[in-house]
């Protein structure tokens, strides 16, 4: 092996395999762009985003870590969410949960 060399297995890497997902339509009713990061608790996003908020409790965007989705003013788009993993305890964000899901 050469220092720094990558040894990558053949095939595709599937993100969040086996976890429950949800696809829903989200609209930005505000007058400014809103960007949501990959691990932000979607239930607690900006109130200008219009969607079935209750159905998103305990979920985040199903996108690669470190990336984000941007919603321009007046824009509507479909997004896919995935269940949060781990201990399923949420603190911070908008302060709407602050504990166990």
UniProtKB/Swiss-Prot annotation:
Keywords: Cytoplasm, Hydrolase. It is found in: Cytoplasm. It is an enzyme of class 3 (hydrolase). Pfam families: Urease_beta. One of its GO terms (cellular component) is urease complex. InterPro entries: Urease_beta-like, Urease_betasu_sf, Urease_subunit. GO terms for biological process: urea catabolic process. It comes from the Bacteria. Its main location: cytoplasm. It catalyses: urea + 2 H2O + H(+) = hydrogencarbonate + 2 NH4(+). The keyword Cytoplasm applies. Pathway: Nitrogen metabolism; urea degradation; CO(2) and NH(3) from urea (urease route): step 1/1. GO terms for molecular function: urease activity. Its EC number is 3.5.1.5. Belongs to the urease beta subunit family. PANTHER family: UREASE. Heterotrimer of UreA (gamma), UreB (beta) and UreC (alpha) subunits. Three heterotrimers associate to form the active enzyme. This is Urease subunit beta. It comes from Ectopseudomonas mendocina (strain ymp).
């Amino acid at each position: 092996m050469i220092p720094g060399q990558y040894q990558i297995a053949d095939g595709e890497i599937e993100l969040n395999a086996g976890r429950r997902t949800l696809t829903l339509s989200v609209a930005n009713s505000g007058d400014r762009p809103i960007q949501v990061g990959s691990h932000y608790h979607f239930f607690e996003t900006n109130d200008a985003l219009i969607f079935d908020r209750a159905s998103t409790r305990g979920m985040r965007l199903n996108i690669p870590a470190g990336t984000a989705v941007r919603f321009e003013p007046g824009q509507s788009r479909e997004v896919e969410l995935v269940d949060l993993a781990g201990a399923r305890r949420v603190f911070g964000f908008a302060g709407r949960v602050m504990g166990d899901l």
